[in-house]
Amino acid sequence: MPQTPPQHVTALAQRAASLCLDFKANDVTLLDLRPVSDMTDYFLIASGTSDTHVRSMAEHVMEELRREGTRVVHVEGLEQGRWVLLDYVDFVIHLFHPTLRQFYQLERLWSDAEVIAVDRQGALK
């Protein structure tokens, strides 16, 4: 699989964040994992207000990114909607029900990663 240029990966992660915000996601956070992990470049973490909201947000992100030419490689948790993982290889999206996000605290687990907050336009702050 060809490697995606770093600036394109960043733009895709920002676009995914913007799509989550379009769907009224809460606490949208982008973690830059490049200095601390070879697994992926970014984690995008966001919360929905209910299982239905989380599922709908995941479907919205997948559909919009697919229309723009980026296909998800692996999906987990879509049926339940409590924690949906969308793996795009260079970035991974974690969409949580708030109680599970609080329980797993991925931001704490990856505390060595740079935390990049995202504003309503999807631009990095």
What do these predicted regions represent?
Residues 86-88:
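Active-site beta-strand termini and strand-to-loop segments that position acidic
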Residues 67-75:
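Active-site phosphate-binding and catalytic loops of NTP-dependent enzymes
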Residues 45-47:
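Short hydrophobic/aromatic beta-strand micro-patches
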Residues 1-35, 52, 56, 63, ...:
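Long, contiguous binding/interaction regions
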